[in-house]
Amino acid sequence: MSENHDAVVYNTNAENGGGCPVAHRRAPHPTQGGGNRGWWPNRLNLKILAKNPAVANPLGGEFTYAEAFRTLDLAAVKQDIAAVLTTSQAWWPADYGHYGPFIIRMAWHSAGTYRISDGRGGAGAGQLRFAPLNSWPDNANLDKARRLLWPVKKKYGQKISWADLMILAGNVALESMGFETFGFAGGRVDVWEPDEDVYWGPETTWLDDERYTGDRELENPLAAVQMGLIYVNPEGPNGNPDPIAAARDIRETFRRMAMNDEETVALIAGGHTFGKTHGAANPDEHVGPEPEGAPIEEQGFGWTSTFGTGRGGDTITSGLEGAWTNTPVSWDNSFFEILFSYEWELTKSPAGANQWKPKDGAGAGTVPDAHDAAKSHAPTMLTTDLALRFDPIYEPISRRFLENPSAFADAFARAWFKLTHRDLGPVARYLGPEVPTETLLWQDPLPAVAHELIDAADVATLKGQILASGLSVSQLVSTAWASASTFRGGDKRGGANGARIRLEPQRGWEVNEPDQLAAVLRTLTRIQEVFNAAQTGGKQVSLADLIVLAGGVAVEQAAANAGFDVEVPFAPGRTDASQEQTDVESFAVLEPTADGFRNYLGKGHRLPAEYLLLDRANQLTLSAPELTVLVGGLRVLGANYQQSPLGVFTATPGSLTNDFFVNLLELGTTWKTTSEDANTFEGRDAATGKVRWTGSRADLVFGSNSELRALAEVYASDDAREKFVHDFVAAWVKVMNLDRFDLV
C-alpha cells in the first residue's frame, strides 16, 4: 500500500551544505529531537503509549494530588490571587491597574484548545506551560500571565496544580471585577511533558490554514481555523473583515468545542466585556521569538518587543488595538450596549490589523486609556464581535442579552464553567468546596448508587446464570468491550458506567452490530430482572455491572478452555443512566469509526488502520504491551466486527491462547494483499501456496513494526502461555474500569 497519509515533516539543518538541502543536510543530535523519525517519518510513534512516565514525575509515586488538594484553604488561595490581580508590576504593568482581563484570557486559552471530536486539548493537564501551546501566536504574552501567578504557586506548592491554578485564577479575576461565577472544581493533575499525541493540524507554518477543503470544510478533529489560533481569526476569515463570513467560522469552531449558539454569544460577549487588545505597532518589525524559540537568557519568556518600552501602552500582542467598553475592569452590559449603539466602520490598528470603530467619530473620548489618565479613546470592535450583531442567528440572541442583563450573566456564567470544566470529566472527579450542586447534561450525569451492592456470593450466582444463558464467549466479550471501550482519556468521557450502550445513540452504532447487541442485552436484562426481583433487602445489580461481569465470565471461560484457571477481578458499583441523562448529539462524537481491537474499519479515513489502532489505544490510556496483549486476546476470543476471520489466527476460537502471536510469527507464511486499498491480506503456506490465514493491517503490524514485533515475540514464546493469559486479564480489567473514578 502506498502510504498516502500525510508525511511527518522533519526539519534538518542545512547549514554549511553548499546550498543543497538534500545531499548535504545534517540530522539533528538526539538531544535536539533527532532519531529514527528523520529516516522513516511514517513509522508508528509508539511513544504516545508511554506518556508521562513515572520516572518523569518529580513528586514520586506516593503523591496523590486529590489528597493534597483537599488540604488546601481555597479561600486563602483566592485572596492571594486577588491581591496579585491589583498589584501592578513594573516589569509588566497591569492595564487599568488590574490584571483581571489578562488572567481571564490565560484561563480561556488554557481551556479553549478542547475539541469534541477526540476529547483532546483543554485545561486538564496544564499544557499551556509547554510547547507548542506556550508559543502559539494566539497565546502571545501569556507567559507573563503565568509568571504573575508564580508567587501563589510557590506559596501553596503541590497542593494546587498549575492546571487548577490557571482556571481558578480566571474565576477569581471575574469575581474581582464584579461577576458571580457558577462555581469551580479542582482535580486537574499536572503533567511534566508536552502532549505529543494531539494532532493540531497539517500546517508547518504559523497561521497557515491547510486544514480546509472544498467549501471551507474543516478537517476533523480540528476546531481552530488556523495553526496557532485558539478559535477563529478575530479579523475575519484569513483576515477578511466580513462579519457574516466570520460568523460561519465562529459557529463551526465553537460547535466543535461543545458550544451552542447561545453559549457562543455569551462567551464572546462576556470575555470582551473586560480588557483590551494590544497592537501598538507592527509585530513583524518589533517582536522577538516566542518562548520556545527565545534565547536562554530570556528564561522562558518570549515575544520581547523593541517598540518603546515594550510593555504598558507600548504592548504588542495580537496587533489589534483598543477596548470594547468604557468600563473594561467591571462586569456590566456595556458590550452589548456599545455594539448596538453605534454604526461601525472599518479601520486599521497601529499595527495594521483590521478592526472597527464607530462611524463619524462617535464615541470618541468615552473609553479610558489603560495606562495614561490623560488619554481617552473611542470603543473598538473586532470583525468577530460584529458577527454577533449581523449574523441572523446570533443577532436575536445578542438583542435578548442586551435587553435582559441577568439572562446574559447567567448564560455567561454557565458557558464559562462549561468551557473551563469540559475536559475535567464526570462530577465524580470534581474537588473542592465550590463544586456546583446543579447537575448539567453535558457532564454525562449518572444516578447515585442507591442500593446495596452485590457480594461475592451474588457474583457467583450471576456467573452461573450467565454461563447458562446460551450466550457465547464472543457475544459476551464483544458486548463488554463495546460498552467500556468508548472511554477517552482526554476528556474522561465514555466507559461502561451508565450502561449507555443500551441507549441512543450507542445501541445503533454500526460498530456495535445493533441486532446482535440487542439480543445480548435482552438476555442480560432478563438475568438482571430475575435477580433483582428475588432480592428482599434492597440489594440490586445494575445492567452496567452485569455487562462487565458477563465479559469477565467469558474471559474466565476462555482461559479455562485454554487450560488456565483464572478469576477476572470485578468491582460492582456502576449505575444505569437514563435516556434523559444522555445527550444524543453529545454522545455521537464518541462513535468509533475505526476500532482495530475489533478489526473494524469504517470509510473515509486518511490514515491506515494501524495508525488508527494506535490512536485508539492512546485514547484508552494503554501501554504498548497492553495494546499488544489485548489485540492478541480479542482475536482468539472472536470479538471481531461481524465475526470477521481477519486476524483469527487460531484453530480453537473461544480459547484464550497465544495462537495469534504464534501463527503470525510462523516463518513459513507469506503474506500478500487481497484488496486494492491494501487493508486485507492472505497468509499462504510458503511451500504449498495454501491459504492459512487472512489478516488486516491492524493484525500484520504486530509482525511488521519492529517494536510491536518485539512484544509479539514475548507472547509467542513457549513459556509465555500463562503470562499471556494473566496479562490479558490485567489489561482487560483496566479497560473495564477506566471510568471507575471511585476506585482510584
Curated annotation (Swiss-Prot):
Assembly description: Homodimer or homotetramer.
Cofactor binding, per record: Binds 1 heme b (iron(II)-protoporphyrin IX) group per dimer.
UniProt-listed Enzyme Commission number(s): 1.11.1.21
Gene Ontology CC terms, in alphabetical order: cytosol
Crosslinked residue numbers (Tryptophyl-tyrosyl-methioninium (Tyr-Met) (with W-108)): Y231-M257
Transmembrane segments: none
Function: Bifunctional enzyme with both catalase and broad-spectrum peroxidase activity.
Tryptophyl-tyrosyl-methioninium (Trp-Tyr) (with M-257) crosslink, residue number(s): W108-Y231
Pfam families attached to this UniProt entry: peroxidase (PF00141)
Residues the record marks as active site: H109
Site (Transition state stabilizer): R105
Protein's recorded name: Catalase-peroxidase
Family of this protein: Belongs to the peroxidase family. Peroxidase/catalase subfamily.
Cofactor: heme b
Catalytic activities: H2O2 + AH2 = A + 2 H2O; 2 H2O2 = O2 + 2 H2O
Protein keywords: Heme, Hydrogen peroxide, Iron, Metal-binding, Oxidoreductase, Peroxidase
GO MF annotation terms: catalase activity; heme binding; metal ion binding
Post-translational modification: Formation of the three residue Trp-Tyr-Met cross-link is important for the catalase, but not the peroxidase activity of the enzyme.
The keyword Ribonucleoprotein belongs to this UniProt entry's keyword annotation: no
Region: Disordered, residue numbers: 353-372
Residue pairs linked by disulfide bridges in the UniProt entry: none
InterPro entries, per the entry: Catalase_peroxidase (IPR000763), Haem_peroxidase (IPR002016), Haem_peroxidase_sf (IPR010255), Peroxidases_AS (IPR019794), Peroxidases_heam-ligand_BS (IPR019793)
Cited Gene3D superfamilies: 1.10.520.10, Peroxidase, domain 2
